[in-house]
């Protein structure tokens, strides 16, 4: 259940819950933003509206506000999680399913994320996604 503290991010809650469950007892905190280090480096390896590297928890939260203003997720699933480097690194593969709010187009996407942990928080995140799936969803109705 989403915390009132993060109610504005409800549109991404399935993603947050999937990530939190993938990390289990490796991190401290209930919500995704609780387990993110204040000085996180969140890198996205695609160019669809986000900066290549987001630095800091506050900036990451601001980016997610933009995300939930454009996309509402209804689910996140097909999680595959692998741990490496004595569980200091977690690699997750997953899918998200939702709606592009401006057009009502279906949004289906696949991701692979490499998560580095320090002091029981997410210190670094490197994200890869199916850019074609995102492009098709975001431009639906424009072609």
Which role fits each region the language model picked out?
Residues 1-38, 142-143:
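Short, low-complexity N-terminal intrinsically disordered segments enriched in polar/charged residues
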Residues 4-7, 17, 45, 49, ...:
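Residue-level detector of alpha-helix boundaries and kinks
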Residues 30-90:
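A solvent-exposed, acidic/Ser-Thr-rich amphipathic alpha-helical stretch
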Residues 14-24, 48-51, 68-72, 93-95:
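Short, mixed-charge, low-aromatic patches
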Residues 1-7, 65-143:
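A beta-strand edge to alpha-helix "cap/lid" segment located at domain peripheries
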Residues 19-23, 36, 42, 54-56, ...:
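Broad hydrophobic/π-residue packing in well-ordered secondary structure
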């Amino acid at each position: 259940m989403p915390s009132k503290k993060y109610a504005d991010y409800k549109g991404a809650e399935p993603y947050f819950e999937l990530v939190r469950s993938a990390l289990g007892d490796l991190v401290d905190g209930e919500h995704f933003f609780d387990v993110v280090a204040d000085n996180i480096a969140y890198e996205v390896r695609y160019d669809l509206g986000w900066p290549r590297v987001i630095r800091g928890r506050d900036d990451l939260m601001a980016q997610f506000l933009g995300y939930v203003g454009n996309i509402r997720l209804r689910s996140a699933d097909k999680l595959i999680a692998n741990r490496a480097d004595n569980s200091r690194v977690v690699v997750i593969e997953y899918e998200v399913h939702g709606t592009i709010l401006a057009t009502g187009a279906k949004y289906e996407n696949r991701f692979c994320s490499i998560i580095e942990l320090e002091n029981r928080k997410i210190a670094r995140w490197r994200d890869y996604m199916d850019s074609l799936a995102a492009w098709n969803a975001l431009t639906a109705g424009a072609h």
